[in-house]
Amino acid sequence: MRRRLALVVLVPFREDDTLARRSQLDHLIQRFRDVAFVDECAPALVVVAKQTFDGRKFNRGQALNIAYAVARERFSSEIDDERTLVVCHDCDMAPRASTAALYFERPSARPGTRVLEASGCRYAADGCFGGVTVYDVESWVATNGYPNGFWGWGGEDHAQFARTVAAGVRVERVPNAAFDDLEQGVETVELKLARLDESNARIRQKEKNELLRLDAKNWRNDGLNALRFSVVSEEVTVSTPALTCVEIDVELLSERPGYAVCHACERDLPESDYSSNSLRRIKWMRERQRTTMHGKSCADCTKKLPNQVAERRNIEANEANLEERLTCMDCATKFESRNALFKHLAATSCGDED
């Protein structure tokens, strides 16, 4: 008899400056194994999508989408679209025994989603989701997952709430769910924001507002159906009849809507900061380093292009004539440097005019 998963739990992960996230993740998986997911008749799959150290801010929404895509690809035969539930789960919320049963309760209406709200949660719940949200598969797919374009902390949960409402999915809130908060020293919103600001991890308010505006218009085209990623490594860390845990290191490749990475300076900037006419002049500068071309360079880099082009052409001309420029034209001896060639010319009759 083929196994049918009761839960697919999606956990987004990125180590931070405190180096505490890994221990939180280990604690969470152990709690899943010992307390929450112990029934062999209701097996759970946990997929942890770990964003690589790519120099960019954490993208929680895209990591959640990737975790689901990997689950569908690797465990498609075990996912029942009518019965399996999809859980979006932060790594710093460890469920207590009294909360375990709540994961397996279906929304009372379909399509529907249930938000497990932690007692004493530091965040206001209106207009957004908390750290643990349970969907039926139909509802999750109807929202098109999370937006892919929120690079940094904050905003993606507000966007996901708006998607859920726009998709006609009913939201049920389950108050006072019992979790242990694994993130220490940030008992208030102010402390949390202060820590994020110290590491420049937050999305700026102006940028967040613009992303929310764009997502309200484009959510059907940016989400599960617009994913680009590369799996760097994959490891099964738990394999029991009741629980399977897979950790994947992934390179996130989906860019945010309305933004593009400049080929010259590699900054992620709004499209309004770019000149499309510059593609012809800069494509050759980046094509050896980048495999995809969005056809835009920012205005600042466009201003610098004439000097950059001239400099690059001089370098290429020198490289093309390097062998000739290191060879004595009289005796055909080749030297390792121009200085060595000049010393040779000074010490011999080579190069003397008759």
Enumerate the language-model features and the residues they cover.
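C-terminal catalytic/acceptor-binding lobe
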Residues: 28, 152, 158-257
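N-terminal C2H2 zinc-finger "knuckle"
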Residues: 263, 325-336
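Short beta-strand-to-loop acidic/aromatic patch adjacent to the donor-nucleotide binding site
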Residues: 76-96
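Short, acidic, metal-binding catalytic loop of nucleotide-sugar glycosyltransferases
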Residues: 2, 16, 24-42
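C-terminal recognition-helix end and immediately following basic linker
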Residues: 281, 313-327, 338-354
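A recurrent flexible, glycine/aromatic-enriched loop bordering the glycosyltransferase active site
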Residues: 117-135, 142, 152
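Active-site-proximal specificity loops/subdomain of glycosyltransferases
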Residues: 22, 26, 39-83
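Conserved donor-nucleotide/metal-binding helix-loop-beta segment in metal-dependent transferases, i.e.
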Residues: 96-122
